[in-house]
Every structure is written in C-alpha cells, then in structure tokens.
C-alpha cells in the first residue's frame, strides 16, 4: 500500500473510532442503533427441557375456581384511563396454598437428582401464571434447585434457586391453557422434606396472551390501526431495525395478582458487553417487585399487511427473567429498566437522541395496542414541555389517522436522523385519542428522553 494511502486509511479509522467512542462516552447527546449479536439462553425463552421427560404428574397440586365473568370484564375496559397500563389478567387467591412435597411422586435422575411434577390449574383460563414460594427451613435456597414450567404450548421455561427470593414470591412465566405443570428438580443432597412450597395466588387470563384475536376478541386493536408491516417504510433497513427493538411487556402486581400489558424499546449503549437497557413508562412498572415479574414478547407482528392469525411471525419469542429498575420518574412518566436476561438474536438496540425534540417534528410510534401485533402510527409534534393530567415535560403528538390505545403505553416516540435511522425521543404516557375520535382529540402525550438523560447517562457508557 502507498505510504500516503496507508496514512489516510489510518486517519479515517482513527476518526471513526473516535466518533464511536464519543457516542459511547458519558454525556453524549446521541447514539446510533446496533444489531444484537448475543444469544438468549434456552431456559429463558421456552426452550428448556424437563429433567425427567417421562415422569408422571402428581395428582396433588393447587386448583383455583374461575373468577366471575363480570370481574374479568371490569378489569379490562376497552378504553383504560390515560396513564394506566392495560389489564389482561386478574388475581385469584386460595386459602390452602401449601403443597406437601413429601406427598409427590419423586423419581431420581441418573445423576442422582430428585424430580417431581405437580399441576397448578384455574378453571377456564386461556393463559395462566402462578406466584410460587419455595424455601428451605433455613430460608436460603441452593442455586442448583430448578423449576421447569410448561402449559398447553410447546414451551418449557426454567428458573433456578438464584431466581427465587425469600422476600417475595416468584411469578412463573405465562403459559397457554388452564394448567401450569411444574417440575421441581432437587440436587442429590437435598430432600423433599427439607423444603416448603406454596402457591398463594395465580393470575388468570380469560383470553390467550399469545393467540389474541387479530380483528375480534381479546387483543384486537381499533379499526384505524396500521400493521407495522404496512408502513410505507417497511422493508427498509432503518425501519425494520426500529421494529425489532420493540417488545410487548407483560407484568404482574404481587399485591393483587393482576397482570398488565405495555410496550417497551431496547436501547443501544456503549458498554461491553452491552447492557439490556429497556425504555418504557413509569406508570407501567411502579416498583421493583413488579419489575421482577416482567416478561417481554419479541417479533410479535404479522408478516403480511393486515394479515390474520395465520400470518403471525414464526419467530415470536418470549423472554422471561424480569428486570431491575434503574430510573423511574412518576412526574415525568419516564422509566429505564435493565432486563435480567439477554434478548433473543435478531433484536435491535435502538438509537436515541438526548437533544430536545423540536416542535413540528414528524414523530413515529411502533406499539402493541391492546396487546395486538405491532402497529405503526405517525403524527406531528404540536407542543413540547407541556403539562397534561398532572404530568410535566411532555411532548404532544397529533395523529392524522392511526392512533394509540391501551397496551401502547411506554412505546417510543421516534424521529428520523439525518442518516435515515430512527432515534428514540420519549415514551407514551397517553391521551384522549381513539379510532374515530374528532380532530380535537386525536392527540397523545409522550415523555421526554432528553429531560432525564443527565440522570441516566451513566448507564449508557462504561
């Protein structure tokens, strides 16, 4: 290589490296997106295996009666109040939550571990998750204790002793059907009589969380909504990347067992390895106990414009494991979580900008209205730094056609950067819009990422 050419090439590389470092440095005003290169663990995405595949399910278990239909209907209104997550499950409790583990049918594996299965059921449930307390008589639980969870679907999820806390119950993943099968796996040096297990409550879903109707039934969004794949930008790398950063959130309140849906966005950062930073709304996750129950659903979209259930993306992936709250500001409705498990391959770490959004900007929103497959809405920023419903520093967006709904809460307000990529600028609080609303009500409000970036910038760089 010619000496001058070589020096020029080195200079270009140095400048590129410097730019990359500047974007990753604390206090940087923006950052481009990036494709995920890590692989989620099979245990957290439903690809675990039973330790004893041929074991029988013990008759002993916990069984819950179905809740009154009017209670289920009352819990999930068609138009929840702005600033509230969409409720999709109700809590059921029992007066006899304990299971005597010594009464189960135990079978040893070839390596000496002890395994047993038992059912947790709720009459008529389309989907189900359970709160489980498992502890030794001394209180602490060995890390090598395993729990496997399965329902009517093919997924088998896994949790270990380190996932369970003596301070609060562990909420299982949401499974399909009215019966959750639990396999308990104990190390060779631990006996069933050494443990106490109880199931104080379950969260009951009257409709399937994963097979929600696409134009009728639970999860069906309004008629004005636009499938994400129908957007004119669909098929471009920038837009498809932005959709791959968005996930449906499902979480449960330990106080009453109610389960809820919001939308969130995975954010890029300069850490190595990357941290799983996840942006949503403060009104979705109120405390750490709730954050610990979070599971995210990725790639939940149709592959054809206005497709029915048969066109659901076959790559839909459920990620369990919960999250930790890094930042929460109820007044501004901002929330930054860190997922405890690595998202699946193919997700995108969304770029962002901490520069205040300009009035008149074109805004984009990719979201899960009523828990439906991903939808796309586009609108114009008509006011910044406003107060609405007691919340401050919000950005107002006016919608000409498609709007947002319950379940869309927390979804990212995006703008397009000079290079054509998308940048997150805030998260959805809510507002008066609905399909068919008059022009005066076709607007909603988003939090402002730039207004809290000084508080959270340390999480985006080493």
Curated annotation (Swiss-Prot):
Question: What does the record give under GO molecular function?
Answer: serine-type peptidase activity
- List the subcellular locations: Secreted
UniProt keyword list: Autocatalytic cleavage, Disulfide bond, Hydrolase, Protease, Secreted, Serine protease, Signal, Virulence, Zymogen
Q: What is the effect of changing residue 283 to A?
A: Loss of activity; no processing of pre-pro-protein
Q: Which residues form the propeptide?
A: 25-211
Q: Does the keyword Disulfide bond apply?
A: yes
The signal peptide annotation in the UniProt record is: 1-24
Kindly state a single biological-process term from the GO annotations of this entry.
lysine catabolic process
Q: How is the polypeptide modified once translated?
A: Experiments performed in E.coli. Processing of pro-endopeptidase to mature endopeptidase is probably autocatalytic, as mutations in the probable active site residues prevent processing, and purified inactive pro-endopeptidase disappears in the presence of active endopeptidase.
Matches recorded under Gene3D superfamilies? Trypsin-like serine proteases (2.40.10.10)
The UniProt record lists the EC number as 3.4.21.50
Can you list the disulfide-bonded cysteine pairs? Answer: 224-435, 230-305, 262-284
Give the catalytic activity: Preferential cleavage: Lys-|-Xaa, including Lys-|-Pro
Q: Which GO terms describe its cellular component?
A: extracellular space
Active site annotated at which positions?
283 (charge relay system), 333 (charge relay system), 409 (charge relay system)
Altering residue 333 to A: what's the impact? Loss of activity; no processing of pre-pro-protein
**Is Transferase among the key words of this record?**
no
Q: What class of enzyme is it?
A: hydrolase
Q: Which PANTHER family match?
A: LYSYL ENDOPEPTIDASE
In UniProt terms, what function does this protein have?
A: Lysine-specific endoprotease. Involved in corneal virulence.
Q: Which family does it belong to?
A: Belongs to the peptidase S1 family.
Designated name of the protein: Lysyl endopeptidase
Species of provenance: Pseudomonas aeruginosa (strain ATCC 15692 / DSM 22644 / CIP 104116 / JCM 14847 / LMG 12228 / 1C / PRS 101 / PAO1)
């Amino acid at each position: 290589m010619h000496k001058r050419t070589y020096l020029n090439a080195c200079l270009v590389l140095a400048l590129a490296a410097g730019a990359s470092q500047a974007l990753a440095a604390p206090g940087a005003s923006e950052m481009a997106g990036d494709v995920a290169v890590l692989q989620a663990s099979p245990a957290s995405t439903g690809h675990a295996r039973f330790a004893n595949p041929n074991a029988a399910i013990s008759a002993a278990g916990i069984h819950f009666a179905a809740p009154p239909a009017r209670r289920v209907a009352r819990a999930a209104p068609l138009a929840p109040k702005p600033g509230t997550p969409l409720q999709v499950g109700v809590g059921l409790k029992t007066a006899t939550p304990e299971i005597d583990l010594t009464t189960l049918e135990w079978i040893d594996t070839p390596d000496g571990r002890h395994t047993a299965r038992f059912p947790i059921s709720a009459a008529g449930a389309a989907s189900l998750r359970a709160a489980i307390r498992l502890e030794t008589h001394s209180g602490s639980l060995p890390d090598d204790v395993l729990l496997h969870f399965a329902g009517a679907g093919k997924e088998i999820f896994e949790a270990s002793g380190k996932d369970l806390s003596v301070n609060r119950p562990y909420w299982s993943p949401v499974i399909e059907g009215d019966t959750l099968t639990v396999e308990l796996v104990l190390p060779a040096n631990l006996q069933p009589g050494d443990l106490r297990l109880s199931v104080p409550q379950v969260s009951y879903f009257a409709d399937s969380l994963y097979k929600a109707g696409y134009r009728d039934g639970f999860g069906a969004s309004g008629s004005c909504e636009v499938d994400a794949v129908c957007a004119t930008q669909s098929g471009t790398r920038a837009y498809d990347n932005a959709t791959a950063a968005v996930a449906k959130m499902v979480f449960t309140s330990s106080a009453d067992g109610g389960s809820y849906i919001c939308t969130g966005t995975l954010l890029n950062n300069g850490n190595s390895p990357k941290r799983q930073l996840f942006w949503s709304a403060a009104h979705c996750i109120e405390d750490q106990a709730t954050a610990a129950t979070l599971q995210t659903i990725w790639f939940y979209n149709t592959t054809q414009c206005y497709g029915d259930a048969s066109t659901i993306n076959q790559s839909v992936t459920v990620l369990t494991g919960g999250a930790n709250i890094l930042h929460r500001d109820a007044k501004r409705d901002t929330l930054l979580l860190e997922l405890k498990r690595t998202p699946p391959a193919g997700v995108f770490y969304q770029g962002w900008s901490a520069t205040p959004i300009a009035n008149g900007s074109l805004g984009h929103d990719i979201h899960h209205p009523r828990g439906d497959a991903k939808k796309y809405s586009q609108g114009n920023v008509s006011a910044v730094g406003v107060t609405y419903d007691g919340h401050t520093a919000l950005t107002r967006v006016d919608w000409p056609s498609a709007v947002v709904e319950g379940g869309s809460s927390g979804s990212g307000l995006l703008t397009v950067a000079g290079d054509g990529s998308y940048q997150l600028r805030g998260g959805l609080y809510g507002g008066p819009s609905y399909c068919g609303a008059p022009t005066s009500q076709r607007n909603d409000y988003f939090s402002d990422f730039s207004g809290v970036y000084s508080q959270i910038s340390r999480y985006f760089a080493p």
